[in-house]
Amino acid sequence: MAAPVMTVSDSKDLRGLNLIAAHSHIRGLGVDATTLEPRASSQGLVGQEKARKAAAVMLQMIKEGKIAGRAVLIAGPPSTGKTAIAMGMAQSLGPDVPFTTLASSEIFSLEMSKTEALTQAFRKSIGVRIKEESEIMEGEVVEIQIDRSVTGSAKQGKLTIKTTDMEAVYDMGSKMIDAMTKERVMAGDIISIDKSSGKITKLGRSYARSRDYDAMGVDTKFLQCPDGELQKRKEVVHTVTLHEIDVINSRTQGFLALFSGDTGEIRSEIRDQINTKVGEWKEEGKAEIVPGVLFIDEVHMLDIECFSYINRALEDDLAPVVIMASNRGNSRIRGTDYRSPHGLPLDFLDRVAIINTHSYTPEEIKQIISIRAQEEEVDVHPDALALLTKIGQEAGLRYASNLITTSQLVSAKRKAKQVEVSDVQRSFQLFYDPARSIKFVAESEKRLIGNTGAVDFSVGAAVSNGEEKMDLS
């Protein structure tokens, strides 16, 4: 009898949607929870202690809801971790506080005005925590009886459900029977039924029925039988943004516009009505305003009209904390001939709290590259790590980070498990850094097409032996 053929798949598991991005290694700001003192290297962030401490103070005030309508500027040279600090703040805020990221160039669109794009970004960054009381039934299913008529008319049934204190029998209609069948509810399950919507949630199985089957799935959860009354009132908290409420109330298709992305321009009258309604909910204690964070990267790309709008928007009652990043020095404000620090108007710069970042030390660059290598699952030899650190100092941290993956591909070509110095050198020769690219452009300027569109093909046509003219013989 022939042995069965064994097949081995050597394909790697895909990471799904969790792809490796530039800041995917950042888990938080890396500060002590009580003293807010920054650690040397923690949660993916290295160095920049003063900037991280300042960001942590802002973060603490945002969490406590003490500040809103403030503007913070993170300013520093390129590759000094400005966006990384903002991403660390986003990770530390948690899921309940809205955090919106916006690149300055995103607001310049033919479909939507600049002020509308900024308004939507501001309203995405303001959360509304709505409290709602719902009546639920929670207990252990004792028995389910379903009567199916011979004629095929509507099904009827009875549900017996109990807690440790009481037991009750309820009549079920066809919709409830279908929901029970869909959730595969059986005797011994502990379920929760929302009376207002009829939603059935299967919480787990009772400990009393744990020996009913010899084998169970890994997702089977055993719980104690609930005690007290069968019917209870439970407070449910939903957190939505003002922009989501705007979209639902402004479009004929309602909440479907949230998924299609076709929000378009939203009229100011609708926003005013929503603001009034949210204010009423707040006074009645039904809702709570959660001021979030709007992060605008490359803020110097905004024009003077946008700065004027942000100036006014920060004075509004419903305004988030605006965090901006800029790597410019004295530069021209877009839309004017004026020059200003960081490319921001002086009257706007007056309102801004500025956090400075400085260049990384060689040791900090080494730690960052090591963290990136771990995130990308690349084993780097210590000598290769030292070379990447040197490249990071001279050519820039981004370029050195990009060389990690390319060096790993070069090492995989020779079936090596560790990235060596030769692999980094090979990648360095294949891919130019900005300095070498500038040098190449300067040397080949006449061969490249200039502003006028002219190019001189005669230059550089000489062969390598030093002849001035091309020899075709």
Swiss-Prot record:
SUPFAM superfamilies to which the protein is assigned, alphabetical: P-loop containing nucleoside triphosphate hydrolases
Main location: nucleus
The protein, known as: RuvB-like helicase 2
Lineage: Eukaryota, Fungi, Dikarya, Ascomycota, Pezizomycotina
Entry similarity comment: Belongs to the RuvB family.
Catalytic activity, as annotated: ATP + H2O = ADP + phosphate + H(+)
Record's subcellular location: Nucleus
Biological role stated in the UniProt entry: DNA helicase which participates in several chromatin remodeling complexes, including the SWR1 and the INO80 complexes. The SWR1 complex mediates the ATP-dependent exchange of histone H2A for the H2A variant HZT1 leading to transcriptional regulation of selected genes by chromatin remodeling. The INO80 complex remodels chromatin by shifting nucleosomes and is involved in DNA repair. Also involved in pre-rRNA processing.
